[in-house]
């Protein structure tokens, strides 16, 4: 039995979608285990170019089951758009399954998210997709789940209980309110759309484990956005770490046989929060591109330009400590082809002392990044399919990352497509 987890080792946007698309070709079940449609996984393969927000990137292996997992909050309307994107490319979604326990992100969740951001009281630059309110609803047990869609009487009773408080919040902002009949109609329509896809995920996963099937878990965002261990409060509302793959799916933690951490060859971040290695001059900013190319540094969901900086080794070490990476995938090495020299942040300095542990948010905003400088390679790595064929300075850069983090780099991305990966 093989149970592999792929997670982001930075702040998201590392290239997880591409790596899942590649690695999922050898798996029987691919599970998105947390998050919602607030971030996207970009995939480029023989079927076309796709920006996936909810559906696991394993959907492109038509012989595997792709599961929208229990730990997710799912906007049914956005899910339908993605399904149409897949079928329009000539693929089937018959292998797409949805956990009965996956929470449904309702229209009022999005309303509340946007209203909270607009109020300016505690704006952290969210995507306004309703993720925070949906996870809050899960914690307060006011949400409904996909399994509930089959029970109209229960839904009516549930909304009669919870809707007054929700409408009270909406009225505070002067926003439009909802009726019970309106929400029940939404649910009736969603049930017609998804009835054949809804499954008992717990039983499905355990049955496949008993059959020694290969299972791949796909995380969203990255460890630095973890609600508990990330750069709080500039975080998401779930746990995009390897351990949560087991927690949200109901499998023993020891069932996980390998963890792959995905990182970019540099650093990026969308939204607010401390960013010790951020660079504002043209050297790094030129890597962003214009937004016209699929691999330019703009958010897959929001289209916002990403903040950019040098590779941050303290972040990768921290991510490794939390997740226990067996291997790393370093993506977008090709984006650095034009740089004459490359810096790596090896440590943080705070009040004239080198920090030995990863700091809390307040201190992180005050640290000074300590760098070492390596020569660039100033030639293209696009089209290279062997580590030995990389420029010497590019190989040295990868080896230095391995030395500093203490994890072998198995995968190296040198372009946006599934085929643009060197496997060592």
From Swiss-Prot:
The keyword Cytoplasm applies. It catalyses: IMP + L-aspartate + GTP = N(6)-(1,2-dicarboxyethyl)-AMP + GDP + phosphate + 2 H(+). It is an enzyme of class 6 (ligase). InterPro entries: Adenylosuccin_syn_GTP-bd, Adenylosuccinate_synth_dom1, Adenylosuccinate_synth_dom2, Adenylosuccinate_synth_dom3, Adenylosuccinate_synthetase, P-loop_NTPase. IMP binds at residues 13-16, 38-41, 127, 141, 236, 304. One of its GO terms (molecular function) is GTP binding. One of its GO terms (cellular component) is cytoplasm. Its cofactor is Mg(2+). GTP binds at residues 12-18, 40-42, 306, 332-334, 413-415. The keyword Nucleotide-binding applies. Keywords: Cytoplasm, GTP-binding, Ligase, Magnesium, Metal-binding, Nucleotide-binding, Purine biosynthesis. This is Adenylosuccinate synthetase 1.
């Amino acid at each position: 039995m093989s149970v592999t987890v792929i997670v982001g080792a930075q702040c998201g946007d590392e290239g997880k979608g591409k790596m899942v698309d590649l690695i999922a070709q050898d798996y029987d079940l691919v599970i998105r285990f947390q998050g919602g449609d607030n971030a996207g996984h970009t995939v480029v393969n023989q079927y076309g170019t796709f920006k996936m927000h909810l559906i696991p990137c394993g959907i492109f292996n038509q012989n595997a089951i792709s599961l929208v997992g229990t730990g997710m909050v799912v906007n049914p309307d956005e899910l339908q758009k993605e399904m149409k994107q897949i079928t329009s490319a000539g693929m089937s979604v018959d292998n797409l399954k949805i956990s009965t326990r996956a929470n449904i992100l309702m229209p009022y969740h999005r309303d509340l998210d946007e209203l909270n951001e607009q109020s300016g009281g505690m704006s952290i630059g969210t995507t306004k997709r309703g993720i925070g309110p949906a996870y809050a609803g899960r914690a307060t047990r006011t949400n409904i789940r996909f399994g509930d869609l089959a029970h109209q009487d229960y839904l009516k009773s549930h909304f009669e209980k919870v809707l007054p408080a929700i409408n009270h919040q909406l009225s505070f902002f002067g926003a439009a309110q909802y009726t019970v009949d309106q929400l029940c109609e939404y649910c009736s329509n969603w049930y017609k759309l998804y009835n054949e896809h809804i499954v008992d995920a717990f039983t499905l996963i355990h049955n496949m484990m008993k059959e020694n099937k290969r299972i791949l878990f796909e995380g969203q965002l990255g460890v630095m956005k973890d609600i508990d261990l990330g750069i709080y409060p500039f975080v998401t509302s779930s746990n995009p770490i390897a351990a949560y793959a087991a927690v949200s799916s109901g499998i023993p933690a020891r069932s996980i046989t390998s963890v792959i951490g995905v990182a970019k060859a540099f650093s990026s971040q969308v939204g607010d929060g401390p960013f010790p290695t951020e660079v504002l001059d043209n050297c790094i900013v030129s890597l962003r591109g214009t937004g016209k190319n699929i691999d330019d540094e703009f958010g897959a969901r929001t289209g916002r330009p990403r903040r950019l900086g040098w590779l941050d080794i303290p972040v990768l070490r921290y991510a490794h400590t939390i997740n226990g990476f067996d291997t790393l995938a370093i993506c977008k090495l090709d984006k650095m082809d034009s740089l004459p020299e490359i810096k790596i942040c090896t440590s943080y300095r705070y009040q004239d002392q080198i920090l030995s542990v990863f700091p809390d948010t307040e201190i992180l905003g005050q640290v000074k990044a300590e760098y070492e400088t390596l020569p660039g390679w100033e030639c293209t790595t696009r089209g290279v399919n062997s580590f030995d064929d990389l420029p010497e300075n590019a190989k040295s850069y990868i080896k230095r990352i391995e030395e500093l983090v203490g994890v072998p780099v198995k995968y190296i991305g040198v372009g946006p497509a599934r085929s643009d990966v060197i496997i060592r």
